Design a protein with these regions (language model features):
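Membrane-embedded alpha-helices and immediately adjacent juxtamembrane helical segments
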Residues: 1-308
Length: 308
């Protein structure tokens, strides 16, 4: 990755300048965005996002199997419907219909069998998706992964479990949290204002979880030591792009396109893969941005070790 060397942004005066400077890129934000776009073309992020979309779609069905089996053990009513309602706020209608169809097809079967098969299938397919994401992040940083295949696969499985924990936490924030607060208001005399405040705060809390997950992914996945301070801009950018592009894509599919007429029975799968493509591309944009910022920071440090 070749970048021009520019001095630290930095005309922040006063004693707080050193504190603020470490959170600013060593090049201007306009330059960061321009170079990020160029790096995306050089690294063929458009093709890498298509690979990620394929693996994400491959992991969808076993993941739904696990959800179907686990939801049956939860002492809550209409959990799956509430989950779909939450997904529908950002996902296109065809994605929700596809998940609902899979749920209806397997929801009446052997719960234990689905849980066993689903977990095994989810581990394999989801770790394959995570492994593809690791390769994509290494490409973004222009580095070759010399680690043994079993080490990469083990890392992918560990990261997959971490993502699963984050998903469970997000679901708890969206679904179980409000019910727990309602129970607390009714039985413990908790101030209703707290419950109302949580209703407003739970989505920002989920967004924070997503940003933290991306931070960890950008920090652990590449075969390179990445300075923590330079991965947060990309994680924030990926989250913003994913939410914004998902909402835009959802509006387009719902109001301006008819994939069912164009693709027939596979229209839902096509829309789902396109949605995953948008999400994968958003992650790669953040990774490329981090790579641009860190490369500039390393080069500046080599040019001026004193940081003056």
């Amino acid at each position: 990755m070749i970048v021009e060397r520019v001095s630290v942004v930095g005309s922040v005066a006063g004693p707080l300048s050193d504190i603020f400077a470490q959170f600013l890129p060593p090049i201007g934000w306009a330059t960061v965005l321009r170079r990020t776009f160029h790096e995306m073309n050089d690294d063929d992020c458009w093709g890498l996002a298509a690979q990620l979309a394929f693996y994400f779609l491959l992991a969808l069905f076993p993941t739904v199997l696990v959800l179907v089996a686990l939801i049956g053990y939860l002492p809550l009513d209409n959990v799956f419907n509430e989950l779909l309602a939450a997904v529908a706020t950002v996902a296109p209608p065809e994605v929700v219909i596809l998940i609902r169809t899979q749920f209806d097809q397997v929801g009446t079967g052997n719960r234990v069998g689905f849980l066993t098969v689903g977990i095994l299938g989810a581990i394999w397919s989801s770790s394959a998706a995570t492994s593809a994401l690791i390769d994509a992040l290494n490409t973004a940083y222009d580095i070759k992964d010399w680690r043994a295949w079993w080490k990469r696969r083990l890392l992918a499985i560990v990261l997959t479990f971490g993502l699963a924990i984050a998903v469970v936490l997000s679901l708890a924030l969206m679904l179980i949290g409000p019910k727990a607060l309602t129970w607390s208001v009714a039985w413990l005399g908790l101030d209703p204002f707290v419950a109302a405040l949580w209703q407003m705060a739970r989505w920002p809390a989920v967004i924070v979880v997503v940003i933290l997950v991306l931070d960890l992914m950008f920090y652990l996945a590449p075969n390179r030591h990445v300075k923590w301070v330079w991965i947060s801009p990309g994680a924030l950018m990926s989250t913003i792009l994913w939410i914004g592009s998902s909402l835009a894509f959802r509006y387009y599919v719902a109001n301006m396109s008819d994939y069912a007429a164009a693709y027939g029975a596979i229209g839902g799968a096509i829309v789902t893969m396109l949605w995953f493509y948008v999400g994968g591309l958003a992650i790669l944009v953040g990774a490329e941005m981090n790579a641009v910022i860190e490369d500039a920071a390393r080069e500046q440090l080599r040019a001026d070790p004193t940081g003056q």
